[in-house]
A protein has these predicted regions:
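Catalytic alpha/beta core domains of metabolic enzymes, predominantly
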Residues: 142, 146, 154-305, 311-314
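Hydrophobic or amphipathic alpha-helical targeting/insertion segments
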Residues: 101-142
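N-terminal amphipathic alpha-helix/helix-capping segment at the start of soluble metabolic enzymes
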Residues: 1-35, 39-42, 301
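N-terminal active-site wall of soluble small-molecule enzyme domains
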Residues: 54-60, 69-109
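Alpha-helix-loop-beta-strand connector modules within alpha/beta enzyme cores
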Residues: 75-96, 129-141, 204-215, 299-303
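Conserved, mostly hydrophobic/aromatic
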Residues: 32, 95, 143, 190, ...
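Glycine-rich, proline-tolerant flexible connector loops at the mouths of alpha/beta enzymes
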Residues: 35-48, 59-85, 115-123, 188-197
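Active-site mouth loops of central-metabolism enzymes
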Residues: 27-52, 71-73, 90-98, 154-170, ...
């Protein structure tokens, strides 16, 4: 059956200074984005805070994040974002609302893209000023349309039941794209986000059937961890399997790390991401001899940041490990009050306590593979 959705063209972001150049759309891999959760207002004058932030950015990058967005509500935040961009290779996006001059300030540095909602940025001349600055800098723009900030006329139609919210989202995006076309600017990515899964799907399907502009897919205000993961999985899997979505961002009331991990797992299960560490772990039951939950919570991020195509099994008892975890490259399992380390189903080491086993696995496998000391040295030397 012929695909009714258009193949998106490629938009490039980054490439200036230390910033990586990344393609969005076309035949480029689907990228994962997230948004920084904290204010950055004082980063530009605090090297200690900057170093800590760069450390987090490095960790996000290792987990699979390709693009990072920051809220820029004031001039100090703009100055901070410019400084951050000097010290990281990850393309950074400035999230701008209301004051177009903040976008202009960010574009004085190596900020890779600007996210604006043209509906709240002001008059057309202000939009044009941002576009001209992006042209000069070689930066891209994401047109970000959310269900909570529709134009008044479309919002009224939705309230009156004369238009669906999904239709209003796509119509808003179409209007804004026409403005950018008139300004002869095509380095544009579009997002249409609702907190409803079906509205998000419908809006993106409508737009993708009409335009070859790359789509940034996300469910806005998706909620706490479990709710947000479910919503994002349903929306993303449907759209991605239809060929819609060139970059994704998961919105959770949780950490950026959890958002990135959720995104990478969705892409993996949709067949759009290969390689990397896979963690398999049992749900735990009355036979448990090992704190599965505690181990996974403590070491998940370090394991997933490894650039290795391996499976790690974390099992609570000998029923699940090594038997059910025999496909794993390395695994740990409880055995009553004792513990074992196994590889491809074969037991390699016995330990008198699960604490000893966990420490051996960390010291002899995880710690050596992460090279965390080297990472810290690299980060410290950058500022």
């Amino acid at each position: 059956m012929e695909n009714k959705f258009l193949t998106p063209k490629t938009v490039f972001i980054g490439g200036s200074g230390k910033t990586k150049r990344i393609g969005i759309g076309g035949h480029e891999p689907i990228t994962i984005q997230t948004m920084w959760k904290e204010e950055i207002v004082n980063i530009y004058e605090d090297d200690v805070a900057l170093n800590d932030l760069l450390n987090r950015i490095d960790n996000l990058q290792k987990l699979g994040c390709s693009i990072l967005r920051f809220a820029v509500p004031d001039v100090k935040s703009a100055l901070s974002l410019v400084k951050i961009a000097e010290h990281t290779s990850m393309p950074l996006v400035a999230d701008i609302h209301f004051d177009y001059k903040l976008a202009l300030e960010c574009l004085k540095g190596n900020v890779a893209a600007i996210r604006i909602n043209p509906g709240n940025i002001g008059s057309r001349d202000k939009v044009e000023a941002v576009v001209n600055a992006c042209k000069e800098k070689g930066a891209a723009i994401r047109i970000g349309v959310n269900s909570g900030s529709l134009p008044k006329d479309l919002a009224q139609l939705v309230e009156q039941g004369k238009m669906t919210r999904a239709k209003a989202l796509s119509e808003t995006a179409i209007r804004e794209v026409s403005v950018f076309n008139e300004l002869n600017f095509d380095q544009v990515v579009v997002s249409m986000k609702a907190s409803s899964v079906q509205e998000t799907i419908d809006a993106n399907e409508t737009f993708a059937s009409m335009y070859d502009i790359p789509l940034h897919v996300g469910v806005t205000e998706a909620g706490p961890l479990i709710t947000g993961v479910v919503k994002s999985t349903l929306a993303f899997s449907k759209l991605i399997n239809e060929g819609i979505g060139s970059t994704i961002s998961v919105s959770l009331s949780s950490t950026p790390e959890n958002e990135v991990i959720t995104g990478r797992e969705i892409l993996h299960e949709c067949g759009k991401r290969t390689g990397g560490v896979t963690i398999v772990s049992c749900p735990r039951c009355g036979r448990v001899g090992f704190d599965v939950h505690g181990f996974v919570d403590r070491w998940q991020n370090e394991l997933l940041s490894l650039d290795k195509n391996i499976t790690v099994a974390v099992m609570g008892c000998v029923v699940n490990g090594p038997g059910e975890g025999k496909h794993a490259d390395i695994g740990i399992a409880g055995a009553g009050s004792k513990a074992i380390i196994f590889k491809k189903g074969e037991i390699e080491h016995h330990f008198e306590t699960t604490t000893e086993a966990a420490q051996w696995l960390i010291d002899n496998k995880i710690t050596k593979m992460t090279n965390r000391t080297i990472v810290r040295q690299e980060i410290t030397s950058r500022i």
